[in-house]
Swiss-Prot record:
Gene3D superfamilies: Farnesyl Diphosphate Synthase
Catalyzed reactions per annotation: (2E,6E)-farnesyl diphosphate = delta-cadinene + diphosphate; (2E,6E)-farnesyl diphosphate = alpha-muurolene + diphosphate; (2E,6E)-farnesyl diphosphate = gamma-muurolene + diphosphate; (2E,6E)-farnesyl diphosphate = alpha-selinene + diphosphate
Protein name per the record: Sesquiterpene synthase Agr1
Entry comment, domain topic: The DDXXD motif is important for the catalytic activity, presumably through binding to Mg(2+).
Membrane-spanning residues: none
Functional note: Terpene cyclase that catalyzes the cyclization of farnesyl diphosphate (FPP) to various sesquiterpenes, including alpha-muurolene, gamma-muurolene, alpha-selinene, beta-selinene, delta-cadinene, alpha-cadinol and delta-cadinol. Delta-cadinene is the major product of Agr1.
Annotated positions binding Mg(2+) 3: 234, 238, 242
Site features described as Plays a critical role in the stabilization of intermediate cation, chain residue numbers: 95
Annotated residues for binding of (2E,6E)-farnesyl diphosphate: 322-323
Residues that hold Mg(2+) 1 according to the record: 98
Amino acid sequence: MCASATRPQPSASNNVKKIILPDLVSHCTFKLRHNRHRKQVTTETKKWLFKDGNLLGQKERAYHGLKCGLLTSMCYPDAGYPQLRVVNDFLTYLFHLDNLSDEMDNRGTTTTADEVLNSLYHPHTWRSSARVGKMTRDFYKRLVLTASPGAQQRFIETFDFFFQSVTQQALDRASGVIPDLESYISLRRDTSGCKPCWAMIEYANNLDIPDEVMDHPIIRSLGEATNDLVTWSNDIFSYSVEQSKGHTHNMIPVVMYQEGLDLQAAVDFVGDMCRQSINRFVEEKARLPSWGPKIDQDVAIYVQGLADWIVGSLHWSFETERYFGKSGRQVKASRIVDLLPRQRLP
């Protein structure tokens, strides 16, 4: 069920100039680590991304401000160089797709999905000159060299879900719909792009975990709790930028609309949900069953990879210029965000 958003959002947000962020960094006690291959991988990914000369001017500046290599390093700290390079290429490319989908109507999203998914499902036979297709085939051919069959399958399936969800997001945007909270959470778990990143944990750490283990309810719950923390905290951190563009695919306006909250109360509401997701992760981790020494060891590495994503994404959000410009560290210390002014429509 979805509610129409053509009615105005709660008026309290129109006059608010600042918000106070929840202190999620202090609530997360996982150890932050870095991968020693970060600088080399960042250099090589930049060459890969820019080799056709298609990212110039503002897009090039946005790439440097993104600091994707730092995110990759924090979230995959134990990966070897070849695997880290593929993961960093993918994450950089994923942010590129995210920017595309944010600006696309439904037709544009579908075209991108066709290019990407055909390149994944048919990497050796699909022929296209589209740059996004060539980039997809390039990193995926490197991934399959060492990824387990299960990791490959989970990567493709979850990336397919990503495109289905961003298509729905584009339709919602075009029709001016704000979904209810339950519908939003379900959709956002796929639009976040997190699920293929969890398959990358398997790949980056050379894991071959049986499908029946990966499908276990506790393993799924751990992935979901991580997805929720990364996604919902991102909704908080990106709110200033998104509201300046009039975007509503964000949990904060959804909560304001459904619960009748003012802006700061909605931020606090989502912050509480983020804390609960970290708590849920810790509780579910303590409930993990045993599948025998070898599988237990691989599962422990996978679960550690999820924890690395929780702590890494939180700290990276204040290092990248994507959300707070060059003021990220100041915002991290004060937790005060000056909201950007609304952009005028052309």
